């Protein structure tokens, strides 16, 4: 894991098209802004895990159930 230190207003680059900017720090929370192309999904980890769990549950449905739902 790469560990970086940034101050408010500073940015880091991921590849050529994704930027992550530190917008603010308040207590133990950090506000960040992510600028990425539309085709790059950006989610908080807990949301990403929920999406993956829903996809897995959908894959377990038999085709007949998918048509009804």
Swiss-Prot record:
Molecular function GO labels: mRNA 5'-UTR binding
UniProt source species: Serratia marcescens
UniProt gene name: csrA
GO biological process: mRNA catabolic process; negative regulation of translational initiation; positive regulation of translational initiation; regulation of carbohydrate metabolic process
Induction conditions: Transcription peaks early in exponential phase, is greater at 37 than 30 degrees Celsius.
Subcellular location: Cytoplasm
InterPro entries the UniProt entry points to: CsrA, CsrA_sf
Protein name as annotated: Translational regulator CsrA
Primary site of residence: cytoplasm
One Pfam short name: CsrA
PANTHER family with a match to the protein in the record: CARBON STORAGE REGULATOR (PTHR34984:SF1)
Organismal lineage: Bacteria, Pseudomonadati, Pseudomonadota, Gammaproteobacteria, Enterobacterales
Subunit: Homodimer; the beta-strands of each monomer intercalate to form a hydrophobic core, while the alpha-helices form wings that extend away from the core.
